[in-house]
Amino acid sequence: MNILSKIKIPEFCMSHWLLRIPLAIIFIQQGLMKIPVDIEEAASYGLSYLVWWFVAYGELLGGIGLVVGGLLNKPYLPILDRCYIPDIGDAITRFSGFTLGCIMTGVIWIGEPESLMDVILYDNLHVLLWVGALFFALRGNHAK
């Protein structure tokens, strides 16, 4: 018998917060930097005003949605037991992750990289944010 299989490792069921909080802070901060939405700033990136508006508010609300979706995972206050809907927090988390993943895909595309290796080697912050957003889009509140 394998000796490692006998060792019981405790499960830290709140570990998703170690990824959720920093990701939310980055996206909220980036969204707040773009507000008020300015047409000249949108034009400097070659985007229309409407797209820039969706990016700014998508980053802000997506970051807030990551936190709110995690908080709605379980009723933390006894008064919330009556109005608790188990899947609403998961849906908010998944939608926020999907929205942020779409925004990060656009950010990477706007950089017009020459190859996939350029993205992986030189645009690693955006790739990290993209992967974090996709993690919550795919796992939702079922992340451990």
Task: Kindly give the residue locations of the regions a language model identified.
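Extended, low-polarity transmembrane helix blocks
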Residues: M1-P36, V51-K144
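Membrane-interface interhelical connector segments
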Residues: I35-Y49
